From Swiss-Prot:
Coiled coil: none annotated. This is Thioredoxin H2-2. Probable thiol-disulfide oxidoreductase that may be involved in the redox regulation of a number of cytosolic enzymes. Residues 3-130 form the Thioredoxin domain. InterPro entries: Thioredoxin-like_sf, Thioredoxin_CS, Thioredoxin_domain, Thioredoxin_H-type-like. Disulfide bonds join C56-C59. It comes from Oryza sativa subsp. japonica (Rice). The keyword Transferase does not apply. The record marks D50 as: Deprotonates C-terminal active site Cys.
């Protein structure tokens, strides 16, 4: 019976960071500063940051959907930040739970999704990308 529950409630393994994913995994403050500087001032570019942790089951559960969104929404930039590696960046964005997805336009937070809420995240990404189109 123990194996039944572990099978039912164990999230899938995290997908590999390699491959064709458009998600930019940020592992250093210098890389974050460079990426943030390159994208923050564009008022039409949606930035989506996935604040997660390797030990977070819900983070691993939603990761394939996040990568899929990054592939489908080419007009947005998708970042993944491990809160244990870049705790200062997570603190700056007031991340208190994982996963937290922060949506940014023109350098300002426009929305946030806390938890592995794939449908809500996709709806918000779609909404803010659509609002960029003129």
């Amino acid at each position: 019976m123990g194996s039944f529950f572990s099978t039912m409630f164990t999230p899938p393994p995290a997908a590999d960071d390699g491959g064709d994913s458009r998600v930019v995994a940020v592992h250093s403050t210098a890389t974050w500063d460079e990426q943030w500087g390159a994208h923050k001032s564009n008022p039409n570019k949606l930035i989506v940051i996935d604040f997660s942790a390797t030990w977070c089951g819900p983070c691993r559960f939603i990761e394939p959907a996040f990568k899929d969104m990054a592939g489908r929404f080419a007009d947005a930039v998708f970042f993944k930040i491990d809160v244990d590696e870049l705790s200062e960046v997570a603190r700056q964005w007031k991340v208190e739970a994982m996963p937290t997805f922060v949506l940014i336009k023109g350098g300002k937070e426009v929305s946030r999704v806390v938890g592995a809420k794939k449908d809500e995240l996709e709806r918000k990404v779609n909404m803010f990308i659509s609002s960029s189109s003129s």
